[in-house]
């Protein structure tokens, strides 16, 4: 209540139209759902595509509290263990990068966006994030083959959790499975930091083998993680008319963006 009352005062001061919160609360928490509803929040819990919201509603989370590397690795799916080992045998190496390595990461990220059909933030965004968070709360890991960067990831670490935030993979040497090795390295970082949870982040809420994002679901599931559904987006409308107009414009923007990305892929 203190949060919502304070937010209302700020909304009035700065002419805000809505307060949005996407809490780390599971969807089956009935008590929390009842509390926020009584406070006046509306719950948007219909997003199935993890790109529909700012924070993904469906994720895979790996409980690593009190576990050893061996225990975690043995709990991987057999194919996942094979691919992690394969990456090492094929000559993949992983190194922790620095701010300068963001240039290689971003170049590969653009390649990934073109292949998978999503828009990419500018290099400056990642540089500013690095300046604000690294090295304590953010790292850049790059996978190399024959001295050439072929894949990269950005994990962030806060409190008792480590999150896989961004990933990029080149169209070349994908058969060398660098993404499996990078996930394993991030899990080991989470263990070193005494994290309780390693969060592999978003997947589709549609669990169907024919769904275009099912491959991502299987990839993350292979690390022994638990499929987790959050409560969704909470929003409190301070100016319902303005917010409705905003949502209409947002829908139009997303449709135009999707058309542009599909055209670019062709």
PLM features: what roles do these ranges have?
Residues 11-25, 190-202:
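Conserved GNAT acetyl-CoA-binding A-motif
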Residues 27-31, 206-208:
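Short catalytic/ligand-binding loop motif for oxyanion handling, primarily in non-cytosolic enzymes
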Residues 23-28, 38-175, 189:
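A conserved beta-strand-loop-helix scaffold within acyl/acetyltransferase catalytic domains
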Residues 4-6, 127-239, 244:
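Aromatic (often tryptophan-rich) hydrophobic motifs at membrane interfaces
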Residues 1-12:
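Acidic, aromatic-enriched beta-alpha/helix-loop junctions
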Residues 32-36:
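Charged, often glycine-rich, active-site loop that binds/positions anionic groups
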Residues 12, 37, 88, 191-192, ...:
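Anion (oxyanion) recognition and catalysis
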Residues 38-67, 197-266:
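Active-site/acyl-donor-binding loops of N-acyltransferases
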